[in-house]
């Protein structure tokens, strides 16, 4: 009876510095940094910044689903990146430090990520209403498209990302009612 193994290791000294300094970058040139957790590129790609680490338990899918639901994003246009090291912004609300553990990720971030997606949607709706010179109440969002039924106008998220960047964050909670959900059941 015999056994063998090949183990190869490497030391990458710059990895830690890179993790501390690199901020997630949205895929488009004119991005909407709606908040610390959601960016929208000029190309319409929604980048969700996850404060929880993906180690095979599906955290990235969970974070993306929460944001996509509230934003009413096209799932094919959603991606997830790891949050940079910043405990003040990305801490686990249950533990007080930036980390993942104790099966707490989705429970910990559920309301927070929903609010962040809703905030991004509200900023896009405000931008569309401003551009189309109409009321925000007349604007709808569905599957990554912003629409004004009365005029027949329609645009993707990316078309309003830069204008939404200058918008004011809505004072009231804009989260969707669960009856309107597509991804969360």
What are these regions (language model features)?
Residues 1-185:
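Cofactor-binding beta-sheet edge motifs in enzyme active sites
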